[in-house]
A protein has these predicted regions:
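Bacterial Sec-dependent N-terminal signal peptides
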Residues: 1-26
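Local beta-strand/beta-hairpin segments that build beta-sheet-rich folds
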Residues: 93-96, 151-155
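Short acidic/polar inter-strand loop motif in beta-rich domains
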Residues: 86-88, 132, 146-153
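Ligand-binding face of N-terminal immunoglobulin V-set domains in extracellular IgSF glycoproteins
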Residues: 119-147
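Short aromatic-acidic-glycine turn motif
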Residues: 86-94, 166
Length: 195
């Protein structure tokens, strides 16, 4: 009986080591740069100069991630999207439950610096995109890592929201001439989306 237990522990130990083999290790669940050569990290709504990194589910308004690599040479970077709970810890959902497409996609847009004292490469990613999109609202992390050795480069938080209802308001003045400036009415209208 003890031989079986020993073999079970050995098997479980090997299995636990292999299951995390392809994933970047040492990741944190907050905005963080793992590499000192990564600078000017911006995550914002696409087309905006500033803004909270939030998009709507099934929206045509994606997010844009931009960062500079001061190493100067081109590096193959990949990204991974992870859904989180309210405390920004990874959720228990599988990727099939919150993603459409495959995780671990390459960042394909980049540009070299021109006429600068410091040589750097700017990487640009617009997501959700045709290769990977989110199917559930919630808190998310995007992890960027080097393709060759899975070394983490940066982590950023973003939110995917879902418009389940809308509120509109209209002001109406009193019809009596003497009370026009004193009595007003606010008409609120709530609309819900069909699910």
């Amino acid at each position: 009986m003890t031989k079986i237990r020993v073999w079970c522990f050995i098997f479980l130990g090997i299995l636990s080591r292999l299951s995390g083999y392809a994933q970047p290790t040492g990741l944190v669940n907050y905005d963080y740069n793992y590499d000192d050569k990564i600078k000017t990290v911006i995550l914002r709504p696409y087309g905006s100069t500033v803004g909270f990194p939030m998009t709507y589910l099934n929206s045509d308004r994606p997010l844009e991630l931009i960062f500079d690599d001061l190493n100067g040479d081109f590096v193959y970077y990949k990204y991974r999207i992870v859904q989180c709970d309210a405390n920004w810890n990874p959720s228990q959902l599988t990727e099939l439950e919150y993603l459409q497409g495959f995780n671990d996609q390459e960042i394909r847009e980049y540009a070299y610096s021109i006429n600068t004292r410091v040589v750097y490469t700017t990487y640009n990613l617009v997501f959700p995109n045709d290769l990977l999109s989110v199917t559930k609202s919630g808190n998310y992390l995007i992890h960027v890592y080097r393709d060759d050795d899975n070394t983490p480069v940066l982590t950023r938080r973003f939110v995917v929201s879902e418009q389940l209802f809308g509120v509109s308001a209209a002001l109406a003045s009193s019809l009596e001439a003497g009370k026009m400036m004193e009595d007003q009415r606010i008409d609120l209208s709530l609309t819900t989306s069909q699910r």
